């Protein structure tokens, strides 16, 4: 943990400083976020008390330009120390937004100012990065999440309009399962903080090409989406363009994953964009897509199967690259220590639970392959901070060219990803399920 003196020294390098709100005069920030308690109306006369950014959830869209420095001021008006993680950005540990890397919390009643040059281009997001334990109102269970889009220097895009959509689950309760473990169930599931039919529709016109940026901000649950009468042409995963854009009938997003997809608006009417699983859509997860000059009850068409495959979007040639590039292999085995009887499990990487997991040293500039072996009965959406990795193998199938920062490793399977250690200092690796992270599913890499 970095003390204040060490942090201020790091600040001169990283471009951020922590101040009392009445401390120093600043030039106006490009963006201002205020963390505070609020009450959100998710359905008619149904309110959720939560913590959010700027009294809204999702928080405001932060739209940046690649390579153009920005300053963000974050004021914490909540009762708890807080922290903001800039998910998917390449930032120094002092401002990445993970206490485990050395980013300081923002104390209650204080402010922090972050100045950085945003990269890489693409659809990113920001969110809290604290522990929740058994309190299903805190951390990622809360409304502390928002969109962040970094526009590329030279590509204006080729679409008629775009929408940003956040999937979230609210008002969780821990319940016991047959194996004795405790898992959350939710009262409401929303898109952009509203249940199906309560929020404003996505208004479109026939012939338009609409770009959808979708992020799963749920603390624990994956989500399946379909748009009745239409298909999604997936063009980016986790904000990174895919080698082989393809049209699919449905999307699958684990916690923290993002999908950018084009939709050709070629079937006029009023449709439902919603969760494929009936019980989740019944909890509210959906939004109306309304063509101009059309009205009436939104139409839903229930898919008969659940289909999703990352590898559809990989390069046509999935063979191993030739050459003399050395790739260092790091095996990471995921399993759990069952506790049961109403208690939380302990999640482990290579037999250890954080903070006792090994900090693995990396050499700057070298290439590494992480070999994930999931020996547990749960799926794990694992996230590597401060890097983008290339997916190389999933469940025995090879691929190339798919760049992500979060990947779902299904129960009982193996996956492999590669990245170059190009970010000096500590980088956190963890499962993005809040309950798994809280119960020890974390470790650090140290690049020197």
Residue spans for each PLM region:
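C-terminal segment of N-terminal export signals and the immediately downstream linker at the start
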Residues: 1, 18-49
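Extended terminal and domain-junction accessory segments
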Residues: 10, 18, 24-32, 135, ...
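N-terminal edge beta-strand
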Residues: 45-63, 188-202, 341-364
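Asparagine-centered strand-capping/turn motif at beta-strand->loop junctions
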Residues: 74-78, 216, 372-376
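Acidic-aromatic/histidine active-site loop/patch
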Residues: 161-208, 215-219, 337, 345-350
């Amino acid at each position: 943990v970095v003390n204040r003196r060490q942090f201020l020294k790091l600040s001169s390098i990283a471009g951020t400083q922590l101040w009392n709100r009445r401390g120093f005069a600043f030039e106006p920030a490009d963006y201002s976020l205020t963390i505070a308690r609020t009450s959100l109306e998710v359905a008619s006369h149904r309110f959720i008390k939560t913590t959010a950014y700027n009294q809204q959830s999702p928080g405001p869209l932060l739209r940046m330009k690649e390579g153009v420095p920005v300053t963000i001021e974050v004021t914490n008006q909540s009762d708890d120390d807080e922290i903001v993680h800039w998910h998917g950005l390449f930032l120094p540990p002092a401002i990445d937004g993970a206490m485990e890397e050395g980013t300081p919390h923002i104390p209650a009643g204080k402010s922090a100012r972050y100045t950085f040059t945003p990269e890489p281009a693409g659809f990113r997001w920001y969110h809290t990065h604290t522990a929740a334990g058994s309190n299903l109102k805190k951390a990622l269970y809360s409304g502390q999440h928002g969109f962040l889009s970094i526009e590329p220097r030279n590509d204006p895009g080729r679409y008629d309009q775009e929408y940003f959509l956040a999937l979230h689950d609210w008002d969780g309760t821990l319940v016991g399962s047959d194996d004795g473990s405790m898992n959350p169930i939710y009262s409401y599931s929303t898109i952009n903080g509203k249940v199906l039919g309560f929020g404003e529709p996505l208004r479109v016109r026939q012939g338009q090409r609409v770009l959808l940026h979708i992020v799963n901000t749920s603390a624990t649950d994956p989500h399946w989406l379909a748009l009745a009468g239409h298909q999604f042409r997936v063009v980016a995963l986790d904000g990174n363009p895919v080698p082989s854009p393809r049209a699919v009938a449905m999307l699958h997003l684990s916690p923290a994953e993002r999908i950018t997809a084009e939709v050709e608006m070629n079937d006029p009417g009023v449709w439902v964009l919603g969760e494929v699983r009936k019980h989740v859509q019944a909890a509210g997860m959906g939004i109306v897509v309304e063509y101009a000059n059309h009205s009436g009850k939104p139409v839903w068409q229930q898919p008969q199967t659940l289909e999703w495959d990352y590898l559809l979007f990989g390069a046509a040639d999935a063979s191993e690259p030739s050459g003399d590039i050395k790739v260092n292999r790091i095996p990471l085995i995921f399993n759990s220590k069952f506790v049961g009887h109403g208690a939380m499990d302990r999640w482990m990487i290579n037999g250890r639970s954080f903070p006792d997991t090994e900090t693995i040293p990396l050499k700057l500039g070298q290439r590494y392959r992480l070999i994930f072996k999931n020996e547990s009965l749960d799926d794990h959406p694992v996230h590597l901070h401060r890097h983008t990795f290339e997916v190389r193998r999933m469940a025995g199938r090879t691929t190339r060219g798919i760049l992500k920062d979060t990947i779902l490793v299904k129960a009982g399977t193996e996956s492999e990803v590669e990245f170059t250690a190009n970010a000096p200092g500590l980088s956190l690796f963890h499962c993005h399920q809040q309950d798994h992270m809280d119960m020890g599913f974390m470790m650090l890499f140290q690049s020197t």
